[in-house]
Amino acid sequence: MPLYLPDDETFASFWPGDNPSLLAALQNVLRQEHSGYIYIWSREGAGRSHLLHAACAELSQRGDAVGYVPLDKRTWFVPEVLEGMEQLALVCIDNIECVAGDEPWEMAIFNLYNRILESGKTRLLITGDRPPRQLNLGLPDLASRLDWGQIYKLQPLSDEDKLQALQLRARLRGFEMPEDVCRFLLKRLDREMRSLFMTLDQLDHASITAQRKLTIPFVKEILKL
């Protein structure tokens, strides 16, 4: 399965907020040469996909083979796509809640997990919108397997952390996002980070096109606020 991931979702562009332990655990698993498993759960939009993309990017840059399976897009492929993935250096399964109750997918994930345990060399990262025991899986053995490893809740960012995350993403894109503009966006817009980053992209494009710096009046004009 071809791997197409956002090139701006790396560990360098992820603002940690109250998640230093999770980031340390991820880095530790990625550094080690043997298998390791981490389950990350959070509400939608907290950044769990970003972390999987970042993990894939880091190992890909080392020349390692990785696999990323977004189960919210499972209609694009079949459960058999997991066959042979135990030979990769890293497997990331995103949004496992999307296949709760889907027997073929649950069995495919369970079998992959067991093959990874046997291989002893593949790192496995899985995300969901709730802890493993609350996923309402139809296969009890899979729920048990998912509960075995390190389990972390990805804590949402505070408003101050969101401000820092916006400014960090802007700097990585090569421009400055003034603090007053950030606070204006947080006050007037949906504060879910994915939405805020999309707005940031829109403002970056508008700023380049108009050859203007980002100010509150300019932002109001572009976003029609």
From Swiss-Prot:
Q: Which InterPro entries match?
A: Chromosome_initiator_DnaA-like, DnaA_dom, Hda, Hda_Enterobact, Hda_lid, P-loop_NTPase
What is the superkingdom listed in this entry's lineage?
Bacteria
GO BP annotation list: DNA replication initiation; negative regulation of DNA-templated DNA replication initiation
SUPFAM superfamilies listed in its UniProt record: P-loop containing nucleoside triphosphate hydrolases
For this UniProt record, give its keywords in alphabetical order, as a comma-separated list: DNA replication, DNA replication inhibitor
Protein task: Mediates the interaction of DNA replication initiator protein DnaA with DNA polymerase subunit beta sliding clamp (dnaN). Stimulates hydrolysis of ATP-DnaA to ADP-DnaA, rendering DnaA inactive for reinitiation, a process called regulatory inhibition of DnaA or RIDA.
The record describes its quaternary structure and partners as: The active form seems to be an ADP-bound monomer. Forms the RIDA complex (regulatory inactivation of DnaA) of ATP-DnaA, ADP-Hda and the DNA-loaded beta sliding clamp (dnaN).
Q: What family is reported?
A: Belongs to the DnaA family. HdA subfamily.
Q: What is this protein called?
A: DnaA regulatory inactivator Hda
Question: Which organism does this sequence originate in?
Answer: Klebsiella pneumoniae subsp. pneumoniae (strain ATCC 700721 / MGH 78578)
